[in-house]
């Protein structure tokens, strides 16, 4: 049996049940564990309570209980520069970003990893539902978490081989109810704490109100694809491709009573296009173009790959053919896909393994670009 006590693991602790159990398991396995609370955002909730302060209290309680040292580190500047500025720039460009993907790439597995190494870390660990498998030659493969409903490899798809080499995911083989049970059995103060939802820096706040603090809203016309004026939209940044709610036109209908969806955007003319029907023609595409495509292990500069892909979190896999050529990557779908959204991540899988992914630039319908920006 190996002596884990000589291996230092620095755990990113958020004050939630997942990272609490991560630290607990590593401590029980004999590792030299240090807990780190990352303060990435200066935040207060609707009641004026600083949520980070409350979360840090939970980290302190759990760390004291399981007997590990803990520190708090402030990454607010890094977060603003590397994640939030990107988030705003994407919305300005008419896209719908995924800040969680960028937060993992730039903060949790870069700024945090760099900091952990200064503490003598051999590995970092987080409460993500994912797994790593190590080959004899040292190559690390990232695998889906066993809990299919909680698998978070979609958000980890931009991690590099170097980052994965230094990473442990102790919860990857567990299902969420087991994690809660372990926390309760150990009497952890976070055992019944509610899971956080929403984008980390928005939390439960109203998204529209939050975004308007940073980007001025520019109302414009809402049109059908055949030119019918449906009224005013509040600003293109508030709508995403395929969105149903919040259009304010539910009572208006054409030939039937089918619900209305966002089916396109024209940033240059500030027009929001809407159409009726979940599978409206304008929502369907046959391929996409992606950039910032990255694989978790070394690949040739140009290659073609048959695999599956996800275009949003918790979506079933779809069969695709991936053509990687220089800066741009083309992804061709075996079956037409609905609401492929510029700015979101496309993530590639080979069975259980997450191969990597990129950011969606454009969707295409039979070679013609879909007007989604």
UniProtKB/Swiss-Prot annotation:
Question: Key word Transcription present in the record?
Answer: no
Name the active site residues: 103 (nucleophile), 200 (cysteine persulfide intermediate)
Q: Which PANTHER family match?
A: MITOCHONDRIAL TRNA-SPECIFIC 2-THIOURIDYLASE 1, TRNA 5-METHYLAMINOMETHYL-2-THIOURIDYLATE -METHYLTRANSFERASE
| CC per GO annotation | cytoplasm
Report which gene this protein is encoded by. mnmA
- SUPFAM superfamilies in UniProt: Adenine nucleotide alpha hydrolases-like
Q: Where is this region: Interaction with tRNA?
A: 150-152, 244-253, 312-313
Q: What is this protein called?
A: tRNA-specific 2-thiouridylase MnmA
Q: Where does ATP bind?
A: 12-19, 38, 127
């Amino acid at each position: 049996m190996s002596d884990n006590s000589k291996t230092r693991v620095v755990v990113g602790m958020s004050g939630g049940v997942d990272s609490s159990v991560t630290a607990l398991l590593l401590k029980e396995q004999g590792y030299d564990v240090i807990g780190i609370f990352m303060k990435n955002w200066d935040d207060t909730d609707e009641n004026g309570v600083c949520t980070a302060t409350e979360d840090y209290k939970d980290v302190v309680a759990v760390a004291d209980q399981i007997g590990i040292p803990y520190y708090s580190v402030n990454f607010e500047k890094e977060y603003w520069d590397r994640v939030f500025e990107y988030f705003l720039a994407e919305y300005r460009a008419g896209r719908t970003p995924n800040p969680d993907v960028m937060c993992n790439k730039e903060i949790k597995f870069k700024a945090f990893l760099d900091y952990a190494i200064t503490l003598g870390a051999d590995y970092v660990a987080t409460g993500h539902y994912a797994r790593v498998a190590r080959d004899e030659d040292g190559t690390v493969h990232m695998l889906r978490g066993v809990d299919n409903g909680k698998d978070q490899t979609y958000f980890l798809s931009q991690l590099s081989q170097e980052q994965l080499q230094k990473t442990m995911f102790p919860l990857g083989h567990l299902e969420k109810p087991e994690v809660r049970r372990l926390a309760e059995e150990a009497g952890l103060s976070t055992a019944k704490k509610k899971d956080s939802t929403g984008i980390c820096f928005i939390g439960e706040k109203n998204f529209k109100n939050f975004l308007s603090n940073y980007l001025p809203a520019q109302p414009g016309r809402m049109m059908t694809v055949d030119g019918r004026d449906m009224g005013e939209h509040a600003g293109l940044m508030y709508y995403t491709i395929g969105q149903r709610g919040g259009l304010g036109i539910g009572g208006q209908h054409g030939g039937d009573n089918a619900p209305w969806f966002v089916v396109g955007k024209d940033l240059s003319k500030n027009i929001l296009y809407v159409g009726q029907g979940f599978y409206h023609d304008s929502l369907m595409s046959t391929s996409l173009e992606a950039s910032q495509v990255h694989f978790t292990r070394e690949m040739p500069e140009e290659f073609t790959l048959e695999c599956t892909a996800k275009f949003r979190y918790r979506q079933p896999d779809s069969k695709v053919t991936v053509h990687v050529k220089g800066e741009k990557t083309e992804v061709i779908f075996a079956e037409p896909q609905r609401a492929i959204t510029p700015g979101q991540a496309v993530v590639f899988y080979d069975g259980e393994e997450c191969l990597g992914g990129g950011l969606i630039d454009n969707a295409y319908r039979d070679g013609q670009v879909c007007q989604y920006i």
